[in-house]
């Protein structure tokens, strides 16, 4: 049975109809409505396509009402939490319903714009109907109506996403030669950069869907599944009190408002992504297929803990309690029995990932401690072993290079791959050589 939502004004315009925003931003809006008196709805815009997709039509047919299911491990125990969400007003198709989308920009109640249009969505392409051009058109309509500016919270996974969106929008406005509009955007609109952190699986598997239908008394085709963990970092300009308008903390959301989000980005990349990248090749060669299997294995569980708490921990410039809580949450997230994170999927493009996610930690550790982090350094040996197999999924150039069977030192000297000559790091080549000389038999074969 579809529940009728309480009439509330539209306060959020959302570009992107996918599962992530519905399980992240829209879930937060529901929490603010329930716990913090936000009193607002989200109007979703499907930014691409000639017509609404079947999932968008299904959500509209339900009056915007759907459920979230948060599944994972909390305090060492598996949990499965079903929640109602009444925060979505409706979904519009940008191409087929642009007049209605533009009318939304003229709503006096509107204050926030959120988006997730993929990493390629925030781009300036002259003459093309990109997402930033759509934003520029909406701001033009709002400016002409004499209404206040808007606050932008892009969730695309690019660095400084708010700054990037603002640059693209102003470039389109400059193309139009509208100096008054440009001045209003610069003065009255706020573009906040963000960092989002929650793993969202999307639709449940058929068996789970049947179980949820029995619990709910209906089959919700718009139900979305994610992990319980969530973290939202919003970089705000000096003097702007976003928390006064967006009471996320009051609603119990794990949010940080900060003038500099870089330490939190570093934390996520090094702890969450780096621990993956440093361990996955060895896990694959040991015969494992999913991350949760690795965490359940005593050897790899200890390995993860050494990497997280002994090697990554000192290189992240944040308070000790914040780092420890996040590192512990990473282990719980890795152990999520509902996630089914495939090791081979995570291993995609491992060379470039190792450069970004692991190497900076090694360099910082050496700078701080004067010695190499043993496990992270030895992860390079496992990377080399993995790239000698037929399981590798990387660019044709990288795959071809490793098929030529280069020596470890040759690989380490490839500055185009690593950004520096790894043999110049004191002791690095010797540590890798020692790791490569040791027994390579996969653990599962010995068990």
What are these regions (language model features)?
Residues 1-447:
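Substrate/ligand-engaging "lid" and interaction regions
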């Amino acid at each position: 049975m579809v529940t009728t939502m309480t009439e509330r004004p539209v306060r959020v315009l959302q570009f992107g109809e996918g599962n992530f925003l519905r399980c992240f931003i829209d879930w937060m809006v529901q929490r603010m409505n329930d716990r913090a008196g936000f009193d607002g709805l989200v109007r979703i815009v499907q930014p691409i396509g000639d017509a609404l997709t079947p999932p968008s039509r299904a959500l509209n047919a339900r009056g915007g009402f759907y459920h979230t299911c948060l599944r994972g491990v909390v305090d060492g125990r598996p949990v499965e939490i079903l929640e109602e969400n009444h925060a979505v007003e409706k979904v519009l198709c940008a191409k087929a319903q642009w007049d209605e989308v533009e009318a939304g920009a003229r709503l006096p109640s509107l204050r926030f714009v959120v988006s997730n249009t993929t990493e390629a969505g925030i781009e300036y392409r002259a003459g093309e109907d990109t997402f930033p051009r759509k934003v520029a058109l909406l701001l033009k309509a709002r400016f002409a109506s004499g209404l206040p500016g808007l606050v932008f919270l892009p969730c695309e996974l690019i660095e400084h996403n708010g700054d990037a969106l603002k640059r693209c929008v102003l470039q389109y406005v400059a193309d139009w030669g509208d100096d008054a509009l440009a001045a209003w955007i610069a003065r009255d609109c706020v573009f906040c950069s963000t960092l989002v952190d929650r793993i969202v699986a999307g639709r449940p598997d058929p068996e789970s869907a049947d179980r949820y239908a029995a619990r709910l008394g209906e089959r919700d085709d718009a139900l979305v599944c994610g992990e319980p963990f969530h973290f939202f970092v919003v970089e705000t300009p000096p003097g702007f009190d976003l928390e006064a308008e967006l009471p996320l903390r009051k609603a119990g959301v794990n949010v940080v408002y900060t003038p500099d989000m870089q330490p939190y980005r570093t934390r996520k990349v090094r702890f969450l992504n780096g621990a993956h990248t440093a361990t996955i090749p060895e896990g694959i060669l040991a015969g494992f297929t999913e991350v949760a299997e690795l965490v359940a294995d005593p050897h790899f569980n200890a390995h993860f803990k050494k990497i997280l708490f002994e090697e990554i921990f000192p290189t992240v410039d944040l308070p000790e309690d914040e780092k420890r809580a996040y590192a512990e949450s990473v282990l719980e997230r890795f152990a999520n029995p509902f996630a089914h994170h495939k090791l081979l999927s995570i291993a995609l493009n491992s060379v470039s990932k190792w450069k970004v996610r692991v190497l900076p930690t090694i360099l910082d550790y050496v700078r701080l401690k004067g010695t190499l982090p043993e496990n992270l350094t030895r992860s390079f040996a496992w990377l080399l072993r993995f790239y000698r197999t037929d399981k590798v999924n990387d660019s044709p150039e990288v795959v071809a290079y490793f098929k030529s069977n280069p020596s470890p030192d040759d690989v380490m000297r490839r500055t185009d791959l690593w950004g520096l000559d790894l043999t110049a790091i004191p002791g690095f080549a010797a540590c890798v050589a020692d790791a490569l000389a040791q027994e390579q038999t996969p653990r599962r074969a010995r068990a």
